[in-house]
């Protein structure tokens, strides 16, 4: 296919136009007074949402260069969500601001390499400062506050705090559709491990890139599956009884993965091959615990020659399995309580005799996973649209809360970023560059610093604007307030953010800044954009 090439300022401006279109659609959702966006879908019902990553994924622009720009910022939003579980809107706002300021500087003659260095160095200074100001969370009340802020609902905040109290801060919490309009919480037997589908062609939910199996049979293999012949009787048995089949193994030969994926796509069998991504003792432990919790064995050559005598009746069972990009969650495993308890007793006995820290930590982790189970939030709604929107909010809140438990919290509402931006005013920051670069280069590096400093103001400005208040007046007042004092968009008053429960997970904010800086740095150093020229039906080319 023929390609079109666009150079220099023209390329950057077109890419920037796409970034701005996507960012303008996403940033209206930020804050408690943020608005919804309705997404029209070709093959399904419209979706009303204020979830930044969902909006970003749906946007396709007609202009090919603008669409590339939109996709670049969309990737940053998705990446932020993958790492921190939330923060996509903040990442989008920061990326838009940094890119606009950066492109303006480069178009006006600044050296993009120097500006890029300034942006990257300044962002790292801010990330380090956020770590210093981060506050660990310990109480259920603090956990509830984080979840409530993320979801925009005190009721959801309470629900997630209850879930963490039931299964522990590092426990497994998942969501499911309720069959009523009410949203409820329950605990069940379950286990989670690092493992993902061996092929993306096995995915059933393209939007979330995950696959869900209801009432599956489960084959757990402690050895690599090399040929389809090894498991053919089990595949045929699963087809006969109508159950989906989950196969978990350390690895699969390419032939096996291809055959399974093709047959799944054809509808011959509902099967998912999951590669266990643990290694060494951790892999052995994960497979053993999975087998016991689902009522089967981790089959290997030591157990009578692999799968030679294994039938469908020997396989494990569970109520539900969710396979995502990095983890697999097995809910309601059908292993007998007596067998699981004996296994727990064995692990506890080993723990008492172990002195090595690695072994102790692994045993404690296994005991916790097997004994605490899984908390399931069953999401209800008056309509399918309402249920989907609520489920997205709960999943965002779960991710934010886990991030807060992991790395702590900072003042919310964009105030932490505004407060730390002042460290970039320090005149001594230039000293580290003086010995290695010219005065002209230094000036352009400091342009990058100024781009980051000004961009850190954008999230709080947008939250104020979305609340219906004049951002210029309120923002000017905030600049003179003490650190931690911000704008409560609900009450439209200035408050101590942390004391008022308006908080953000440190990990989310750091990741959003890191990804935004990466987008801006890439775009300002772009000199050429290349895209396909579409062909019309007559064979001549058209843009």
Curated annotation (Swiss-Prot):
Catalyzed reactions: ATP + H2O + a folded polypeptide = ADP + phosphate + an unfolded polypeptide
Pfam families: Cpn60_TCP1 (PF00118)
UniProt entry keywords in alphabetical sequence: ATP-binding, Chaperone, Cytoplasm, Isomerase, Nucleotide-binding
GO biological process entries: protein refolding
Gene3D superfamilies per the UniProt record, alphabetical: GroEL (3.50.7.10), GroEL-like equatorial domain (1.10.560.10), TCP-1-like chaperonin intermediate domain (3.30.260.10)
Cellular localization per UniProt: Cytoplasm
SUBUNIT field: Forms a cylinder of 14 subunits composed of two heptameric rings stacked back-to-back. Interacts with the co-chaperonin GroES.
Function per UniProt: Together with its co-chaperonin GroES, plays an essential role in assisting protein folding. The GroEL-GroES system forms a nano-cage that allows encapsulation of the non-native substrate proteins and provides a physical environment optimized to promote and accelerate protein folding.
Official protein name in the record: Chaperonin GroEL
Organism of this sequence: Mycoplasma pneumoniae (strain ATCC 29342 / M129 / Subtype 1)
């Amino acid at each position: 296919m023929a390609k079109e090439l666009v150079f220099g300022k023209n390329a950057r401006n077109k890419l920037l136009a796409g970034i701005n279109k996507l960012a303008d659609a996403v940033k209206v959702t930020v804050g408690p007074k943020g608005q919804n966006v309705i997404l029209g879908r070709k093959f399904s019902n419209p979706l009303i949402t204020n979830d930044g990553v969902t909006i970003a994924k749906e946007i396709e622009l007609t202009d090919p260069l603008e669409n590339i720009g939109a996709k670049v910022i969309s990737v940053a939003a998705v990446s932020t969500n993958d790492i921190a579980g939330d923060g996509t809107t903040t990442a989008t706002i920061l990326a838009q601001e940094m890119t606009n300021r950066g492109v303006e500087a480069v178009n006006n003659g600044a050296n993009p390499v120097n500006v890029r260095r300034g942006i990257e160095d300044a962002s790292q200074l801010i990330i380090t400062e956020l770590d210093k100001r981060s506050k660990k969370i310990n109480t259920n009340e603090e956990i509830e506050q984080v979840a409530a802020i993320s979801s925009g609902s005190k009721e959801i905040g309470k629900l997630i705090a209850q879930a963490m109290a039931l299964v522990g801060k590092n426990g497994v919490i998942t969501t499911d559709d309720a069959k009523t309009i009410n949203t409820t919480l329950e605990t069940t037997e379950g286990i989670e491990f690092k493992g993902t589908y061996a092929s993306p062609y096995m995915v059933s939910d393209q939007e979330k890139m995950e696959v869900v199996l209801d009432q599956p049979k489960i084959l757990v293999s402690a050895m690599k599956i090399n040929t389809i012949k090894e498991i053919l009787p089990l595949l045929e048995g699963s087809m006969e009884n109508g159950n989906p089949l989950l196969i978990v193994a350390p690895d699969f030969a390419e032939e096996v993965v291809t055959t399974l994926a093709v047959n799944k796509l054809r509808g011959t069998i509902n099967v998912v091959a999951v590669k266990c991504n643990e290694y060494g003792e951790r892999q052995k432990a994960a497979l053993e615990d999975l087998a016991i919790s689902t009522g089967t064995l981790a089959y290997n050559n030591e157990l009578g020659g692999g799968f030679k005598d294994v039938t469908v009746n020997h396989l494990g069972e569970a109520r539900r399995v969710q396979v995502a990009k990095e983890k697999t969650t097995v809910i309601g495993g059908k292993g007998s309580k007596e067998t699981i308890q004996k296994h727990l007793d064995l692990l506890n006995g080993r723990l008492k005799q172990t002195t090595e820290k690695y072994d102790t930590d692994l045993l404690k982790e296994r005991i916790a996973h097997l004994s605490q189970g899984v908390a399931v939030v069953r999401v209800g709604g008056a309509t399918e649209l309402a249920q989907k929107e609520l489920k997205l909010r709960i999943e965002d809140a779960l991710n934010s809360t886990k991030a807060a438990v992991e790395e702590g919290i900072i003042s919310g509402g964009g105030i932490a970023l505004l407060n730390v931006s002042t460290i970039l005013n320090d005149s001594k920051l230039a000293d580290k560059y003086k010995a290695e670069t010219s005065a002209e280069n230094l000036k352009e590096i400091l342009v990058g610093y100024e781009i980051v400093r000004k961009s850190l103001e954008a999230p709080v400005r947008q939250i104020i604007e979305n609340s219906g208040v004049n951002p210029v007046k309120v923002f000017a007042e905030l600049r003179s307030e003490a650190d931690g004092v911000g704008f409560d968009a609900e009450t439209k008053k200035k408050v101590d953010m942390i004391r008022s429960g308006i908080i953000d997970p440190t990990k989310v904010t750091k990741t959003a800044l890191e990804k935004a800086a990466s987008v801006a740095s890439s775009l300002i150093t772009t000199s050429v954009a290349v895209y396909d020229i579409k062909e019309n039906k007559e064979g001549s080319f058209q843009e």
